[in-house]
Curated annotation (Swiss-Prot):
Principal cellular location given in the protein's record: cytoplasm
Protein known as: Phosphoribosyl-AMP cyclohydrolase
Lineage, top ranks: Bacteria, Pseudomonadati, Thermodesulfobacteriota, Desulfobulbia, Desulfobulbales
Reactions the enzyme catalyzes: 1-(5-phospho-beta-D-ribosyl)-5'-AMP + H2O = 1-(5-phospho-beta-D-ribosyl)-5-[(5-phospho-beta-D-ribosylamino)methylideneamino]imidazole-4-carboxamide
Biological source species: Desulfotalea psychrophila (strain LSv54 / DSM 12343)
UniProt keyword Protein biosynthesis, yes or no: no
Family membership: Belongs to the PRA-CH family.
Amino acid sequence: MVELNFEKSVDGLLPAVVQDYVSGEVLMLAYINKLSWEKTLETGQAHYWSRSRNSLWLKGESSGNVQVIHDILVDCDSDTVVFKVDQIGDAACHTGHRSCFFRRVHQGELVVEGKPLFDPAQVYGSK
């Protein structure tokens, strides 16, 4: 198995940049630990470590918007990865947008681009 340098991070978490494998669009940034890395390699589906829940997270386990791994790039220090994925279900972001990067800075202000592809309240329930 490919070993990453989890010891380099104080909390054992490494960044994972997630891109659409066809278009190259950046879909999200998430974090992985050793367990989520192993699960990703074992299953071929993106697994992350949820910092808010402090638990393993299979992308799409609640929404159905799973990420199938097509390619993985590892940086020169083995402490950051790029997951090139097939985004099943169109939306990668928990807000319902295709990408978590749906806001652009324009003249010092945040401007929302595009509309959500699903209603998060219907998928995840009210908080």
